[in-house]
């Protein structure tokens, strides 16, 4: 599905952000990316979607070599990659529905996107996604009126509206409280399982990574120093990733509460007001 081989990234300053990184991720696999600040986690994610050009190595999404693409070919490849950001990256003045539909911009023509006129099928899908993430009652609310957890759910729905094969998720809980963080992580893992989506989750919270992510990749100074199950994150392994620390307890025995009701299935027909198709 996603194959990264011997990936390097050296910035113009001479700093080597990634050194010989190799990862193979299958369909439906969700991988947690952990490591100290400056380890190269965000750089790796940005190399995959080509926001940052790698210096060397290979990144293949299916049969497509991403490192050689440019222009229209790169734009088409990016349709297959959904992004979920730490700071949500919503358009504040637009409604929840309009933000989710922005995930379809790569599939509609210029004028349709300019006037935000989306096909009815896209509107139906957006309604179903918002129901799935627990926001069916917030459709017409502006993004700047939402809580942090609600904003991240909009970001998740927008990424899924692209119908991606791969999700790149950069610090999805950094701006959230502990309870909301657990709810968001559970939602992400459930959605990936339902759709057999591959995902890379850059996450700073080791406890959350252990709770929700079956496979963990540890980066230190741009190199992979651990790639294995979450259960293998022993104190010695964590020390090799982060340095000396008291790792006697990295996760709490907590009850995970999922506030996102499992509502409309994407395949279920929805009755729409015709005016909604002209959003």
Curated annotation (Swiss-Prot):
Domain ABC transporter: 2-246
Superkingdom in the source lineage: Bacteria
Chief location of this protein within or outside the cell: membrane
Catalytic activity: phosphonate(out) + ATP + H2O = phosphonate(in) + ADP + phosphate + H(+)
Membrane topology summary: Peripheral membrane protein
EC number, as in UniProt: 7.3.2.2
Pfam families: ABC_tran
Compartments reported by the entry: Cell inner membrane
An example molecular function term from Gene Ontology annotations: ABC-type phosphonate transporter activity
Enzyme class, UniProt record, top EC level: translocase
Record GO cellular component, one term: plasma membrane
Keywords of the record: ATP-binding, Cell inner membrane, Cell membrane, Membrane, Nucleotide-binding, Phosphonate transport, Translocase, Transport
Subunit structure: The complex is composed of two ATP-binding proteins (PhnC), two transmembrane proteins (PhnE) and a solute-binding protein (PhnD).
Summary of the function given for this chain in its UniProt record: Part of the ABC transporter complex PhnCDE involved in phosphonates import. Responsible for energy coupling to the transport system.
Family of the protein in this entry: Belongs to the ABC transporter superfamily. Phosphonates importer (TC 3.A.1.9.1) family.
Protein name, UniProt field: Phosphonates import ATP-binding protein PhnC 1
Lineage of producing organism: Bacteria, Pseudomonadati, Pseudomonadota, Alphaproteobacteria, Hyphomicrobiales
Gene of this entry: phnC1
């Amino acid at each position: 599905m996603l194959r990264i081989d011997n990936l390097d990234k050296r910035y113009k300053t001479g700093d080597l952000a990634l050194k010989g990184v190799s990862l193979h991720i299958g369909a439906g696999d969700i991988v947690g990316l952990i490591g100290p600040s400056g380890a190269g986690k965000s750089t790796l994610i940005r190399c995959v979607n080509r926001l940052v050009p790698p210096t060397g190595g290979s990144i293949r999404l299916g049969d497509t070599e991403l490192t050689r693409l440019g222009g229209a070919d790169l734009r088409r490849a990016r349709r297959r990659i959904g992004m979920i950001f730490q700071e949500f990256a919503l358009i504040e003045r637009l409604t929840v529905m309009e933000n989710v539909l922005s995930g379809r911009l790569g599939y509609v023509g210029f004028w349709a996107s300019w006037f935000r006129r989306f096909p009815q099928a896209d509107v139906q899908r957006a309604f179903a996604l918002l129901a799935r993430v627990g926001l069916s009652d917030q459709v017409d609310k502006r993004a700047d009126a939402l809580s942090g957890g609600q904003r991240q759910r909009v970001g998740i729905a927008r990424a899924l509206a692209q119908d991606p094969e791969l999700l790149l998720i950069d610090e999805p809980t950094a701006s959230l409280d502990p309870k909301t963080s657990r709810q968001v992580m559970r939602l992400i893992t459930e959605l990936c399982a339902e759709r057999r989506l591959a995902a890379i989750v850059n996450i700073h919270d080791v406890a959350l990574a252990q709770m929700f992510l079956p496979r963990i990749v540890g980066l230190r100074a741009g190199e992979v120093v651990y790639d294995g199950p979450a259960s293998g994150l022993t104190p010695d392994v964590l020390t090799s990733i982060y340095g000396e620390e008291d790792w006697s307890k990295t996760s709490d025995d907590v009850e995970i509460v999922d506030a996102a009701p499992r509502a409309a299935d994407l395949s279920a027909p929805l009755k729409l007001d015709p005016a909604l198709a002209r959003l």
